[in-house]
């Protein structure tokens, strides 16, 4: 049988309190919890999945970034507008892509861009 890669599920630093991070990602960013055990949890939204890991090492979070393509970028920007996070402007970049950045309370940076 030929080897075929499936999906990628990045490990996402959650900060020192996993429950606070879960609350942010579930109630704020619209993910759903798939599982939780000990210092880890799995979250998912529309096929995009992460494994949250409780950690106290801020440099990991400050150096973690993820780029996620979405349909409905304008609506997502409005949805995330009231989050307790740093939200950058929604803008067209010089390379021709509309996007915005969000920095979660843990320090993780998300770049969201319009698909198509």
Which residues are covered by each model-predicted region?
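Short hydrophobic/aromatic beta-strand element in the GNAT-like acyltransferase core
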Residues: 40, 49, 67, 87, ...
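Conserved short beta-strand elements that form part of the metal-binding/catalytic scaffold
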Residues: 32-64, 109-114
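N-terminal beta-strand motif that seeds the catalytic metal site of vicinal oxygen chelate
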Residues: 1-22, 66, 116
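Short amphipathic alpha-helices within nucleic acid-binding modules
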Residues: 62, 74-79
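Vicinal oxygen chelate
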Residues: 1-3, 77, 81-116
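Conserved acetyl-CoA-binding loop of GNAT-fold acetyltransferases
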Residues: 27-33, 84-85
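Short glycine-enriched loop/turn motifs at secondary-structure junctions
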Residues: 3-6, 58-63, 93-94
